[in-house]
UniProtKB/Swiss-Prot annotation:
The lineage of its organism: Bacteria, Bacillati, Bacillota, Bacilli, Lactobacillales. Specifically methylates guanosine-37 in various tRNAs. InterPro entries: Alpha/beta_knot_MTases, tRNA_m1G_MeTrfase_C_sf, tRNA_m1G_MeTrfase_TrmD, tRNA_m1G_MTases_N, tRNA_MeTrfase_TRMD/TRM10. CDD domains: TrmD-like. SUPFAM superfamilies: alpha/beta knot. S-adenosyl-L-methionine binds at residues 108, 127-132. It catalyses: guanosine(37) in tRNA + S-adenosyl-L-methionine = N(1)-methylguanosine(37) in tRNA + S-adenosyl-L-homocysteine + H(+). PANTHER family: TRNA (GUANINE-N(1)-)-METHYLTRANSFERASE (PTHR46417:SF1). Belongs to the RNA methyltransferase TrmD family. This is tRNA (guanine-N(1)-)-methyltransferase. It is found in: Cytoplasm. GO terms for biological process: tRNA N1-guanine methylation. It comes from Streptococcus pyogenes serotype M18 (strain MGAS8232). It holds the Pfam family tRNA_m1G_MT.
Length: 239
């Protein structure tokens, strides 16, 4: 995968040189470049200007963004604008982006964008109902969530399949050594070696956590008969 990021602050992306994204680069599975679009700005390197019609703040000008993208050597990229008014980012969205060969991210600052920038864009993405100072943190989040889904990036192809949201449910609780820590013990079922009982316990715990913390996810979840019975059992136990 090739990723190009347009930003006024390339140095903010240093964390992507580490952990999973850094390993993806080392394996040759990811090629990532940062472009300071101030370098392409006309008018004394100004990237922002006052909005026509008046209003608060400054807007990102179209010219630096257009010129930066036009010099990037790509074929058919997904061009992503980070915008609080965009489509909410989800695990399913990350899975979709992980299938792409080329991604371009536009990280804004200031009050907003000249609307004409959006003629370049294929996707407008938001992390949620809040506003960040710029698009850099959002871009890093999306890159991390996407790159880890590229085949061969994680140690095992199944490593991400049990993650929260990948199945549509929140992930079940997990434990490691020691068995007893300060009086808190590992559930006996996980020590039993009985694979079917462990599977059912994990499924029930996933359903329980999702029901208690994110019931909205269950509204669009496609239940199997087994899952429906387990959820009914959970609801009855909780009263």
């Amino acid at each position: 995968m090739k990723i190009d990021i347009l930003t006024l602050f390339p140095e903010m992306f240093a964390p992507l040189e580490h952990s999973i994204v850094g390993k993806a680069k080392e394996k040759g599975l990811l090629d990532i470049h940062y472009h300071n679009f101030r370098d392409y700005a006309e008018k004394a390197r100004h990237v922002d200007d006052e909005p026509y019609g008046g209003g608060q703040g400054m807007l990102l000008r179209a010219q630096p963004i257009f010129d930066t993208i036009e010099q990037i050597e790509v074929k058919k990229p997904r061009i992503i604008l980070l915008d609080p008014a965009g489509k909410p980012f989800t695990q399913a969205y990350a899975e979709e982006l992980a299938l792409e060969e080329e991604l371009i991210f536009i990280c804004g600052h200031y009050e907003g964008y000249d609307e004409r920038i959006k003629t370049l864009v294929t996707d407008e993405i938001s992390l949620g109902d809040f506003v960040l100072t710029g698009g850099e943190l959002a871009a890093m989040t999306i890159v991390d969530a996407t790159v880890r889904l590229i085949p061969q990036v994680l140690g095992k192809e199944s490593s991400h399949q049990d993650d929260s949201f990948s199945s549509g449910l929140l992930e079940y609780p997990q434990y490691t050594r020691p068995y007893d820590y300060r009086g808190m013990t590992v559930p006996d079922v996980l020590m039993s070696g009985h694979h079917e009982r462990i599977r059912l316990w994990r499924l029930e715990e996933s359903l329980r956590k999702t029901y208690l913390r994110r019931p909205d996810l269950l509204e669009r979840y496609d239940f199997s008969e087994e899952e429906r019975k387990l959820l009914d059992k959970i609801k009855e136990a909780l009263g």
